Amino acid sequence: MKTGRIIKSISGVYRVDVDGEMYDTKPRGLFRKNKFSPIVGDVVDFEVENVTEGYIHHVHERKNEIKRPPVSNVDHLIIVMSAVEPDFSTQLLDRFLVIAHSYHMRPRILVTKKDLTSLEKQHDIEKLLEVYENMSYKTQFISINEDIEQVFSSWGDGLAVLSGQSGVGKSTLLNKYFPNIEIETQHISKALNRGRHTTRHVELFERAKGFIADTPGFSALDYDHIQKDEIKNYFMEIHEYGATCKFRDCNHINEPKCNVKAELENGNIAQFRYDHYLQLFKEISNRKERY
């Protein structure tokens, strides 16, 4: 029995990487019976049938799972924001940070298009990034000429997935790091006589110190798995200062003897961060339950 990570899935065949050796595997019938399918990122135990093929017997417990695209066991969520077109948004950034923490992923903030930004706006963005750096978030502000190898290798060990809204440069980053992915995709689409909206299969590729998914990541923010009382745990400074509030169930809104409100008044919590917390708390409080 061998253990490896699924790096690719096509038509019920799962390619498993075991220390650089590849095996094309299929799940045992028990998986179909239980209506459970392995996904890219899963760590699996499989039995080798011949030199390069085998059957999956067991899928290890997932530490997290992204639905769109379906990827499991993600270590790093690279939140890609652009300086311009679209403009840098702390509100959107904070929402992606909440998603990252809710799935127990380590977030990193990557801002693109520095070369297209005025010096004044660069300074404004750098001042905002300092707020996040003071909370121990890792940040990068890059231009088109950046050393892409160094950018990707700085993320540390494990599986990284890019996230961010359309137009921020996720696909550009991936195609620069893997220059043959786009060519291969176009070739396959043309061969299958499909349009430009051909669905891509998720695949993991090796990078320095780990893997990265070749998908441009997810851009839709889904909070269905988050309850309103959990949001305070995903704003790092609010979680930290909230530990000394008078009441353990304090949501830091109108409650008495709230340490978060006191630290906000003292300037230790950025007003825009607190405002974004309130907005998200209200949204989740007002959502209709799905049945």
Curated annotation (Swiss-Prot):
Monomer. Associates with 30S ribosomal subunit, binds 16S rRNA. It comes from Staphylococcus saprophyticus subsp. saprophyticus (strain ATCC 15305 / DSM 20229 / NCIMB 8711 / NCTC 7292 / S-41). Belongs to the TRAFAC class YlqF/YawG GTPase family. RsgA subfamily. GO terms for cellular component: cytoplasm. GO terms for biological process: ribosomal small subunit biogenesis. Its EC number is 3.6.1.-. Its cofactor is Zn(2+). PROSITE patterns: ENGC_GTPASE (PS50936), G_CP (PS51721). Keywords: Cytoplasm, GTP-binding, Hydrolase, Metal-binding, Nucleotide-binding, Ribosome biogenesis, RNA-binding, rRNA-binding, Zinc. This is Small ribosomal subunit biogenesis GTPase RsgA. It is an enzyme of class 3 (hydrolase). Residues 63-221 form the CP-type G domain. It comes from the Bacteria. Zn(2+) binds at C245, C250, H252, C258. Binds 1 zinc ion per subunit. It holds the Pfam family RsgA_N. The keyword Secreted does not apply. One of several proteins that assist in the late maturation steps of the functional core of the 30S ribosomal subunit. Helps release RbfA from mature subunits. May play a role in the assembly of ribosomal proteins into the subunit. Circularly permuted GTPase that catalyzes slow GTP hydrolysis, GTPase activity is stimulated by the 30S ribosomal subunit. GTP binds at T112, K113, K114, D115, G164, Q165, S166, G167, V168, G169, K170, S171, T172. It is found in: Cytoplasm. One of its GO terms (molecular function) is GTPase activity.
